[in-house]
Amino acid sequence: MDDEEPERAERAAAPAASDPAGGLDYSRLYEYRFKDVDQDARQRVWNEIARYLWERLGRPRRVLDPAGGRGEFVNAVPAEERWLVDVVDYPERNTDPAVRIVIGDLFDIDLPDAYFDAVFASNLLEHFRSPEDVARFLDRMRATIAPGGVLALMGPNYKYCADEYFDCADHLLALTHLSVQEHLFAAGYHVREVVPRFLPFSFRSRLPASPALTRLYLRMPALWRIQGKQFLILANP
């Protein structure tokens, strides 16, 4: 898995993606960050991760990715209904036509209430400007989750990747699995599962972009405790 991440870093709640008045130009930032990334290889990695997570989340029927980027997760997750939200409208996004795409600020767009069986947010929280923004996001997602649904959060765990955590220009908040649990509790969620070390911070230089090796990694939690630098947390509203 020599492609960047699965820390995708395309964010749904950022300022205007290509408007200099909005501050950081996210379109140009991600163009630079992923200029040498093989998107096909990256999708192959996510094919395995998405299927694994879908099973772990209880095979949800309706899934929302609120920071969907180029669609790697929603392309692969075998849910009946898939939604992608992102602030960046990537011209090269090659998303399954069955995926419903919503472009815009996550806090401004319309989403159905009590609708999704699962919300999966990957590498999003660290891009918010303040703990208050994290709280707003958790409240926003709680409103969209159906009764019995689940919120899954994945992101770099500062406790295990402090040296490289701020190598990304848009990483603003230092978060660990412990601080995220506090955020969830404060927002009224019930934390049901915590994996402090799940995926590597970046798969670039760790493993080749091989579906077989990705599957092997996902089936061997002992490897997570060595390579894992991202947390995975599941919580119910």
Segments from the language model and where they lie:
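Active-site beta-alpha loop architecture of Rossmann-like, nucleotide-cofactor-dependent enzymes
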Residues: 126
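S-adenosyl-L-methionine-dependent methyltransferase catalytic module, highlighting the catalytic core
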Residues: 28, 32, 36-44, 107, ...
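Conserved N-terminal segment of class I S-adenosyl-L-methionine
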Residues: 1-114, 118-122, 134, 138, ...
